[in-house]
Each structure stands twice: as C-alpha cells, then as structure tokens.
Amino acid sequence: MLKRIDRYIIKKFLGTFFFMLGLIMLLSVVFDISEKLSEFISNKAPLKEIFFEYYVTFVLYYGNTFSSMIIFLSVIWFTAKMAQDTEIIPIWFSGRPVSRFLRPYFIGATFLTILSLILNHFIVPRTNKVRLAFEEKYYRDILTVDDYQAEYPGNELVYFSNYSGQDQRIHDLTIQKWSKDQEPIYFLRARFAQNIPGTNKWRLTDYYEKDYRFPKGLLIHGRSKDTTFSYRIDEMAQRENAAQALTFSELKTAIEREKIKGSKLVPEFEIELHTRTAFPFATYILTIIGVSVASQKKRGGIGLDIAIGLFLVFVYIFAMKMLTVAATKVGLSTLIAVWLPNLLFAVIASIFYRRAQK
C-alpha cells in the first residue's frame, strides 16, 4: 500500500516529467518551424496538415524517443530540489533503506516504461507513417535510387540503374531467374518499368523477355506489357528512416525480407527494433543514477546536479551513436550495439547506488 510520501514522490516524478517533456517539445517545435518554414511556404503546405499531420506526430515521435533522457533530468531536478529543501533528510533519519526510498521512483518509472513500450511498438509507428508521408510531400528532396541490386526468393535477381520519385519510373530494369541447379530459366529487360502504387502490378515499356524453358529459348520483344511481380517499388526505393513507420510485426517481416535480399538496410531495421525496447528499459537505470546523484544536499546546489546529469546524458547518447555506427559500418552485432550502453550504465548505476547507501 502506498504511503503519503510515496504518493508525494510519484506525483512529483510524473508532474516534473510531463512539464519538462512539454517544455522541451515546445522548444523543439519552435526550432523545427524556424528551420522548415520556408519549405512549407514554398510547397504550399496547408496549415491544418502542418499542425495535425506533422507536428502532432512530431511531438509523439521525438517526445517518446527521448523520454528516458527527459525522465533522467526530471528525476535529478525534483530530487535535488527536495534535497535542497531538506525534505529528504527526515527520510534518511527515519532509518529507511535506500531501496525503500526508491520504491515510488520505480513505480513511476514502471508506468512510463510500459507507456513508452506500447507507444514504441504499436502507436508511434502508425503516426510516423503520417509524419513521413507529410515530409515526403512538402519537405524532402525527391527520392532517387541508383544501381539497385537484390536477390529475391526463388533465385530471382533484380537490378535497375535508376529510380526517380518524380516520375515514379524505374530505368533499365533487369530480372534474371535460375533453377535450383543454377541453370538460367528466365530473363527480362525493360527500358522503363512503373509499379502501380500499393499493388504488385507493373507496367513495362520497351521490353525484351526470354524464357529458357522453351526449346532453345523464346525471345519476345514488345512496346508495353502489364504484369505482376512478387515485390513493390516501396520495398526497393525507401529512405533509411523507413523502419520508423513499421509496427513490431511489420518490422520483423521486413528484416527477414531484407536479409534474403542481402540488403544494406538490415542493420538499420534491426537497430530500430532493438532500440524500441532498450530505450524504455534505460528508464530504470537512469532513475537509479538520478536519485543517487541528486538525493544528497550539495554546496553547488541544484545546478551541480543538473550539470552532472547533462554530462551523463551526453555520454549515454555518444555511446549509443558510436556503437550504432559500428553496427552499420563495421558489422558489430546490432543487439550488442543497442544494449551495451544500458549494460555499461547499469554498472555505473550500481556504483552510484552503493555510494548512496553509505
């Protein structure tokens, strides 16, 4: 059963977090508007779409992404304030262990962790679809892909020289298929190819087609042809942040599909999947560090605690970025790259916790 002090700390915890979250997101929106306003005006983006389709989803995405960091700073802020106001001293003199003092913090952290996990895996990906579609329409440069090559199930190799989102056409499409014995069974080359959006239907222009299963092979040339393939253009031509718009099940499916193709996007997709779980669980680690750092009254006041907190946040983000680069460029396991900062900071948290006990 929660005591008055527990309810007081939980109220302080959640209240400070949502206040800081709102303040930081407000500043983020202001800076983002100043950066993108000219593009919105030049591309004639409607005000309604800017607000509802972009900035509402913008706040959901970035607020949830950095929630563990904001929780950390919130814990340091209100705990240091309690320490400076000598609200914590009676708790220490009452003989309560540090673990009991941490109980309301962990209740608040658990609530925010569960909320973040639900948002990360199920809600934010759907709102990201709206946000990324808006960016594609009103802000980003036209998507282009050069020298695409991938292997699809059924020993099917697909290559094209160029794709432009402006006319949504593939240039110089080549498709080759082999049998299980690595014998060529099919060849297709088209000067242009266009995928009907949202379907597996394609329109080929100026194409050559050869099926080796016919006697001596039959070469067909035509001006135009409608056909179907097992893939779509949005699987071939996609930005690096495409994984942000995939739910948990969609992301798992996409990873398996990209692995078969030997795609360079596999590490990006795996990092996105692991990060959605690792970041929320960092809340517990950062909460322990925050309480341990800020629960003692210091001569430097709250400012010193905030400085320590900002330094640790910087180190955490730097470690995440370095290991992410190692996973995408050097081949480090994405699971290790995402979870290692949490493990390192768990060790740091245990050190701070032991010092707080003393």
What residue spans do the PLM features occupy?
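Transmembrane alpha-helices
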Residues: M1-G154, G165, R213-P215, S230-K358
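Structural signature for solvent-exposed beta-strand/loop edge elements and short helix-capping sites
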Residues: Y152-Y207
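A short, polar/proline- and glycine-enriched secondary-structure boundary/capping micro-motif
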Residues: E183-Y186, Y212-G222
